A protein has these predicted regions:
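ATP-dependent helicase/translocase motor core
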Residues: 1-71, 76-192
Length: 192
């Protein structure tokens, strides 16, 4: 038996994190998206040459429905603490306007809800942190309730309307992250 400390980040995701997510009721085909690249990388210009920087890629993004991300998860190998990826997860959650940032090393989860009470984030919204064992990851409905609070979808009609698909492409393309944020922002202002 290989020690958990010897496993790579990818192994931690496949052997510990994904099974914990699935056990909490998440549909692995429609609600879980792995290795999500959301920027192509910063462009650097030097003289007449250009070069792309490193693209930003989230380890896992959880969706309640298509185009409605409710959590971003950053994993680290087991030589790190469970919360070692939190700064990166928070950065991605802020960029993608996702209400929950999660970090894990395969021993458990550190979850930061960006809208409840406690510390204030860069966007002026409060942040609260919670630790969870592998067998106590939040369910889709729990994170959906949090999403509704984060986006101030206070009526049932507002919540239902936000679930209506606003984009469909037979080729499987989806809006870029900044387009999705703009669409949701317009929806939010129309519903409030």
């Amino acid at each position: 038996m290989v020690s958990k400390k010897a496993l790579s980040e990818r192994d931690i995701i496949s052997k510990y994190i994904l099974p914990a997510i699935e056990q909490s009721g998440w549909n692995m085909q429609t609600q879980v998206n792995e290795e999500v690249s959301f920027t192509d990388g910063r462009i650097f210009v030097k003289g007449r040459k250009t070069k792309r920087g490193i693209r930003k890629r989230a380890d896992i993004i959880l969706y309640y429905k298509a185009n409605i991300p409710v959590a971003v998860i950053e994993a680290k190998d087991n030589n790190h603490t469970a919360g070692a990826g939190m700064q990166q997860a928070l950065e991605y959650a802020e960029m993608l306007d996702i209400p929950v940032a999660v970090a894990s090393n395969g021993d458990g989860f550190v979850i930061q809800y960006r809208n409840n009470c406690g510390q204030i984030g860069n966007n002026g919204k409060p942040i609260v942190t919670e630790n969870a064992d592998l067998d106590h990851f939040p369910t889709p409905d729990e994170l959906w309730d949090n999403y509704k609070k984060y986006n101030k979808l206070e009526t049932e009609k507002a919540a239902e309307t936000s679930l209506c698909p606003y984009f469909f492409d037979a080729a499987g393309r989806t809006p870029r992250y900044y387009q999705r944020i703009a669409i949701i922002s317009v929806q939010r202002h129309r519903l409030v």
